[in-house]
Amino acid sequence: MRILVTNDDGIDADGLSVLCSIMERFGEVYVVAPDNEQSAVGHSITLAQPLRMREVVRGGKLFGYAVNGTPADCVKLALYELSRRLFGEDSGPGSFDLLVSGLNRGANLGINAFYSGTVAAALEGVIAGVPSIAVSVEGYSQVDFGQAGGIARRVLARVIDCRSQVPWSFLNINIPSVPEGRIRGVRISKQNISGFQERFEERKDPRGETIYWMTGGIVPLQEKSDDDTKLLADGYVSVTPLCYDMTNYRLKERLEKIDMSHLVKEEQQ
């Protein structure tokens, strides 16, 4: 099995190295990641400047490729360009059997998943038809990637066979940052819809110009027992199936009951 590994923390991130070691147990690993941290860039892609992809060698061996772009850029380059270089001119996204993005420093829960470069990389993979999984670890300052990696390996081993059974879908896995003995288990979850209370701190830079730092916190909504935010807070590993079909089918059904057949004709009269 050919596995594409990427992230948004950058090619030098500890979590990426741990993930590579994990995925080598499952197949051939190919790494394409940003050359610097790209956290919270979402699903942005680079259009106004050229992309560069350079080889990264560690211990005398090729570790992977660093790209001066976003996680989505990395996935696109890997699936549509690097695949041709490695596997032949007729190769493309189908050359890879699986894409795994992570191990991200910091959980990607609720609506924060929309801002996450880690999740966006998995989304880009599934858009191209490659089964994809995003894996994140709670916490920022002190993250035990060794422990998280062991948990991720066991969870991935169980869910990896489900990766291609549902089109347009991928998995978003979040691991709590607590001692392993306190992790209560693994739960299938849904995405929490809590918003973010946006606030900005106004400061002055050394030149006396006004600058702003974004801050704030999660807007408390009623959490349900099976949503990702609640489960992680309760010490569970959350596994959330996500998809890129953003259609609101309930609203679509309601709108279809409204007679709009005459609206264009009225405008033309």
Walk through the language-model features, giving the residues of each.
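Short, glycine-/small-residue-rich phosphate/pyrophosphate-handling segment
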Residues: I133-C162
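Glycine/threonine-rich flexible loop motifs
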Residues: A107-S116
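C-terminal accessory domains and tails appended to enzymatic cores
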Residues: C162-V166, P176-Q269
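Short, glycine-rich nucleotide/cofactor-binding loops
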Residues: V5-D12, N112
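A cross-family phosphate/adenosyl-ligand binding-site feature
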Residues: R2-I3, D14-G94
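Conserved acidic residues
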Residues: D97-L98
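Hydrophobic/aromatic ligand-binding patch that stacks against planar heteroaromatic rings
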Residues: A121-G125
